[in-house]
Curated annotation (Swiss-Prot):
Residues 10-79 form the HTH merR-type domain. The lineage of its organism: Bacteria, Pseudomonadati, Pseudomonadota, Alphaproteobacteria, Hyphomicrobiales. The keyword DNA-binding applies. GO terms for molecular function: DNA binding; DNA-binding transcription factor activity. The gene is nolA. This is Nodulation protein NolA. PROSITE patterns: HTH_MERR_1, HTH_MERR_2. Keywords: DNA-binding, Nitrogen fixation, Nodulation. SUPFAM superfamilies: Putative DNA-binding domain (SSF46955).
Amino acid sequence: MNRATPRRRRWRIGELAEATGVTVRTLHHYEHTGLLAATERTEGGHRMYDRESGQRVHQIRALRELGFSLVEIRKAMEGTTSLTDLLRKHLERIEVQVARTTLLRDRLRNMTIDSEAQVSVDELPATLNAMSRAETRSQTSRCTCNLAAEREDRWRRIRDDLRDCMDGGEHPCGERAKAVAVAARLLISEIAGDDSRVSMILKVLARLSAPRSLAGWDPCLMQYLDLALGGLEDQPY
């Protein structure tokens, strides 16, 4: 008498998500992009997965941690692209990012370590621009020298207009101060995008400036700008 072959273990999508450490939504996305397919479906239409499905999810996660896109992962897993070639190209991208990040680190170190150095808040646009380049994987356009100079001029005008508001007793949330804050927010957004660290950078530079004034920016003016920007939080860009 032949013994029945035991049925292989099957997992529902929620069970697979828990076993592999991802969300159900992520598994649905993997299916949508062709990276994962259900082994079978129940009569009720529920997706079922097997052991190989779990292994595939772990492989996808490993490649994602290396920084590969889902498109690249699919090509590698389907064999249409050599994984070695993908790794080599990705290494080249990482080396470029490391070089950019190292340059940014050196700039920030020069601005903060040397206690005798004059840290100019007017350099903020250039600093944020460098940060944006260092963190962006694909840079489609670069700021020319003329554009950088134009932005620095705008930043100085913002400083002067803000100083006039503060010296004139204008409340940080007053109409004139708001108009200047809108211009400041727009300029910062052009350079850094939706980066939550902008406020942090402003506060750090304000602390570094005490007790001296840096290119016309002092802690009081920095705080005034911070309050004016805070008054715009509920307003759209």
